[in-house]
Amino acid sequence: MKKHLILLLFLPAVLFSQENNKFSKTITSEDLESIMFGKENIKFSKTIIVEDLEKHLNILASDSLEGRETGKAGQKMAADYIMNHFINLGIPPSVTTENKHTKTHKAGYYQKFKIRSKRHVCKCEDCDVDFIKDLFGVNKWIKGENVLGYIEGTDLKDELIIITAHYDHLGKHDSLVFNGADDDGSGTVAALEIAEAFMLAKKAGHGPRRSVLIMPVSGEEKGLLGSKHYTDNPVFPLENTVANLNIDMIGRLDDWHDTANYVYLIGADRLSQELHDISEQVNKEYIGLNLEYKFNKEDDPNRYYYRSDHYNFAKNNIPVIFYFNGIHEDYHKVTDTVEKIDFKKIETITRLVFLTAWELANRDKRIVVDKIKN
């Protein structure tokens, strides 16, 4: 017991010591100088690299964080790690007001919430639902944090793009740690790298015209609670939110594929045909992944459109794209571990998300919402 407590107290210092450089060690001053010339978007996308993704995930999906269950010590340590990353990138605090619904961390990076959880969202048919319900309990008060990394834009700064991933997972049951390397450690580290790429751009004089909010959320595994709290209590006006790009499970292959050159896109054309077209064009010009839409059909029996954090934005008529690699045999199991992750796959998809966000943030006119449903 004492050894366990010492480990928990010691871990934040270890985590923060690994985040003591303002930017990635892999980016030199010569790199920054070269980035300032030429086609900035693709050059900054290349600062998103396997080595940094792997470094972050080895920490966030380690046993020491005990599965990052919302409300537990491991989730709090993960939140601190993410916040520290934002601070070291030079991202200032953005949350400065408090009311009875939204309490904030003194440094202004946390949006705290306390919500009663009544359900758990399971994304597959064969996961052990009875076990998951027993693990979480029902109708309990959940305390969590969304971590906000706000990168202010220039001439169109009142509008913003929100990039989300959930950093919580299933936690620990008896002696078993559910590391959640793919679900959703993969999306979380992607968000951290996107934040770095945008801040490198800003440092070099190429900051986004629209503001960009990088927001790793918690409470997803409890029923999309963190993102729901944000859309119910937005820090920035929802009417100024151009789009939400949500990243959830991008580090593995599903049973339908034997190569990594694919990603499922869900939701891109549900509210804005223009968002879908931009996404397709960005991929065609820069990345070349196979963009697959089998889970985007309205009659999809899996109903993935309703089952990750983007849906809380879509409910508010904000266009969304959900980036997803599909379900695999280790989903919601203790075997969802770092050594099974394809980091090159994460790198490629993360660059696609960044380049799509770059286009949305820098185009003259915000995308048109032409498919509003009541």
Q: What residue spans do the PLM features occupy?
A:
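N-terminal hydrophobic or amphipathic helices/low-complexity stretches enriched
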Residues: 18-78, 82-96, 151-153, 370, ...
